[in-house]
Amino acid sequence: MGKPSSMDTKFKDDLFRKYVQFHESKVDTTTSRQRPGSDECLRVAASTLLSLHKVDPFYRFRLIQFYEVVESSLRSLSSSSLRALHGAFSMLETVGINLFLYPWKKEFRSIKTYTGPFVYYVKSTLLEEDIRAILSCMGYTPELGTAYKLRELVETLQVKMVSFELFLAKVECEQMLEIHSQVKDKGYSELDIVSERKSSAEDVRGCSDALRRRAEGREHLTASMSRVALQKSASERAAKDYYKPRVTKPSRSVDAYDSYWESRKPPLKASLSLRKEPVATDVGDDLKDEIIRPSPSLLTMASSPHGSPDVLPPASPSNGPALLRGTYFSTQDDVDLYTDSEPRATYRRQDALRPDVWLLRNDAHSLYHKRSPPAKESALSKCQSCGLSCSSSLCQRCDSLLTCPPASKPSAFPSKASTHDSLAHGASLREKYPGQTQGLDRLPHLHSKSKPSTTPTSRCGFCNRPGATNTCTQCSKVSCDACLSAYHYDPCYKKSELHKFMPNNQLNYKSTQLSHLVYR
């Protein structure tokens, strides 16, 4: 944008001359040519002049500050609009035309501001200072606040130029009304059209396209910001879900629910076979998880009060004292979980009458031996009902309890096994060489309780009767031959499968490792 070229200036001067000629021809009576009926050609020429490309809008109006007057009126007066401004400029143009056509007439030398047309078309649309500035350019001065009076000398050329610019202002209002009709659906107001027209050198079509593109860009930006806001809110919700504290309550699904309650159950103590937990263990010992099975030599030793000389090997002198340790256990198992039909007190009473078994461990050879404590009297008891002599506490004929001799008093120091390790070592040596020792009279001091020895027999884990000759290799459950065929479908508690029973004479010393220490 810049100053108009000489061609543009010449085009404006030609239009001004045609405008003056058009209005002067209305009052010229000397010429016989036909008067022009409409100023349509002047309007088209004025539109072309106002739409000249690359011409600064400042040079469109020189005597009237058109865009400033329109902006102040639209902002300050609620009754003002582009159409109302078009009417106000048209009335002021009429005042100027009458003044330069009939300067001698007195009615045009004064303008009453309280008349109806002036109040309705001019004062309701334009500000008072703007009206005063325009009329001052024509030669009018305000008088007593109710009228404008013409000065003595009238500059006809100045009045013609002001009237011509008022004509251009009227045409410019028509163009801005056309632009507003094209872009009002985009949310533009008349004031936005005036601002765009004031700063743009484009014609009507160019201004309309520019406003439409700007509106579309604003809509696209708004939509993009809305999408960004939605994505941000969605990401915030996802982050809240991700960092939400986890529920520590177990799931209600089948697996988690079952595992939760299985972990809450107390450990089931198996009491169906020869499994036993040690009463007192040494924390420093590295005990192996193994099951010790009875051997023929152990059974031979258990049948004799003094044992067999081939069972306990001589201890090496280099091992020193405290190599032989003893732990007390009961020979009978706990109540059967499968065939328990009698009160538990009965079995507790029977357990109190059963003899004890001592387990001796030799640290030098890592062997476990099973033997019964020495007895001072016969282990056979006679049944008071049928008169049958039995080695166990239960009659094998009538299943009645047998009366056993009273047990000897426990040792004064039952739990101090470490202080009697040398005594136990000496007892084992005297047991192997009976001719050079004085007997095993001091051995009972190592135990917490001594009872008459009996022939070791295992009770069936199903029927609780003596004579169990089969043992499960997985859970150590024992069974007799009769129950082995009757309960072959019984599941093993160690694994989710059936029992694997084997005869006792075919068992090895080691079996499948369990998660607990088992002594036989």
Swiss-Prot record:
Signal peptide: none annotated. GO terms for cellular component: cytoplasm; cytosol; fibrillar center; nucleoplasm. CDD domains: Bbox1 (cd19757). Its main location: cytoplasm. A motif (PIM motif) lies at residues 327-344. Residues 84-156 form the PUB domain. GO terms for biological process: necroptotic process; protein K63-linked deubiquitination; protein linear deubiquitination; regulation of inflammatory response; regulation of necroptotic process; regulation of tumor necrosis factor-mediated signaling pathway; seminiferous tubule development; spermatogenesis. Keywords: Cytoplasm, Developmental protein, Necrosis, Nucleus, Phosphoprotein. Coiled coil: none annotated. Residues 301-323, 434-458 are annotated as: Disordered. The modification Phosphoserine is found at residue 253. It is found in: Cytoplasm; Nucleus. GO terms for molecular function: protein-containing complex binding; signaling receptor complex adaptor activity; ubiquitin-specific protease binding. Present at high level in Sertoli cells, but not detected in spermatogenic cells (at protein level). Low expression in spleen, thymus and prostate. It comes from the Eukaryota. InterPro entries: SPATA2_PUB-like. PANTHER family: SPERMATOGENESIS-ASSOCIATED PROTEIN 2, SPERMATOGENESIS-ASSOCIATED PROTEIN 2/TAMOZHENNIC. Belongs to the SPATA2 family. Bridging factor that mediates the recruitment of CYLD to the LUBAC complex, thereby regulating TNF-alpha-induced necroptosis. Acts as a direct binding intermediate that bridges RNF31/HOIP, the catalytic subunit of the LUBAC complex, and the deubiquitinase (CYLD), thereby recruiting CYLD to the TNF-R1 signaling complex (TNF-RSC). Required to activate the 'Met-1'- (linear) and 'Lys-63'-linked deubiquitinase activities of CYLD. Controls the kinase activity of RIPK1 and TNF-alpha-induced necroptosis by promoting 'Met-1'-linked deubiquitination of RIPK1 by CYLD. Interacts (via the PIM motif) with RNF31/HOIP (via the PUB domain); the interaction is direct. Interacts (via the PUB domain) with CYLD; the interaction is direct. This is Spermatogenesis-associated protein 2. It comes from Homo sapiens. The gene is SPATA2.
